Amino acid sequence: MEGKMPLIGEKFPEMEVVTNLGNIKLPDDFKGKWFVLFSHPGDFTPVCTTEFFSFAKHHDDFKKLNTELIGLSVDSKISHIEWINWIKQNLKIDIKFPIIADPMGHVATKLGMIQAQSATQTVRAVFIVDDRSTIRAILYYPMETGRNISEILRLIKSLQMVDKYKIVTPANWPNNEIIGDNVLNPPPATQNDIEERTKKYKGYAWWLTYQDANKADVDEAKEITGE
């Protein structure tokens, strides 16, 4: 599994992985679906346990967005099974998504998930892959800070709206401080685009115009992110 780390806009590399739920072929087994592949430094650790609890709590919200979850660490399959059983018994929640067992670190190395300070532990990385197997976003968090699961949901919803409506979303959407839950138009490409934008849309300048977002999409975004 040698090679450079995959980048946003590239196809997710093909691989077969071992999980607590059986072997999976990536990305082939998820064709037609989005998926979030996220790594964690280790089983039976405090921050990772809170993250898995939150991912499990929001599992149905990811499914509403046609998105599957896949965890990963360099722990063994047995360790994953024991850990999620502990979470179920003590925190009263089921982890129903697969967790990749990568004890030799081959998958983590291929995806650029290994920490600089440690040759064996994975960082808190997130790969968001769309229904065409294209990497749409890559996020990294330090060991000391747990991920915001609502932000990952918001990002997926935004990317799906970009695909559907050919728009772009502002900071903190759907609660932007300037245009609220409206969405932005992408930068105009030609002089004709500039003239059309200023006639058709509201805005502050020819390069900063916006339009109403679909209400159902706004409502869903607010629901899944808890806004």
From Swiss-Prot:
Residue positions of the active site: C48
Main location: cytoplasm
EC numbers, comma separated: 1.11.1.24
Keywords per UniProt: Antioxidant, Cytoplasm, Oxidoreductase, Peroxidase, Redox-active center
Recorded GO CC terms: cytosol
Example GO biological process: cell redox homeostasis
GO function terms (MF aspect): thioredoxin peroxidase activity
Catalytic activity of the protein: a hydroperoxide + [thioredoxin]-dithiol = an alcohol + [thioredoxin]-disulfide + H2O
SUPFAM superfamilies named in the record: Thioredoxin-like
Compartments where located: Cytoplasm
Note: The active site is a conserved redox-active cysteine residue, the peroxidatic cysteine (C(P)), which makes the nucleophilic attack on the peroxide substrate. The peroxide oxidizes the C(P)-SH to cysteine sulfenic acid (C(P)-SOH), which then reacts with another cysteine residue, the resolving cysteine (C(R)), to form a disulfide bridge. The disulfide is subsequently reduced by an appropriate electron donor to complete the catalytic cycle. In this 1-Cys peroxiredoxin, no C(R) is present and C(P) instead forms a disulfide with a cysteine from another protein or with a small thiol molecule.
Role this protein plays: Thiol-specific peroxidase that catalyzes the reduction of hydrogen peroxide and organic hydroperoxides to water and alcohols, respectively. Plays a role in cell protection against oxidative stress by detoxifying peroxides.
HAMAP family: Peroxiredoxin
Family (UniProt): Belongs to the peroxiredoxin family. Prx6 subfamily.
Quaternary structure and partners: Homodecamer. Pentamer of dimers that assemble into a ring structure.
PANTHER family in the record: ALKYL HYDROPEROXIDE REDUCTASE C, THIOREDOXIN PEROXIDASE
Cross-referenced NCBIfam families: PRK13189.1, PRK13191.1
Protein name per Swiss-Prot or TrEMBL: Peroxiredoxin 1
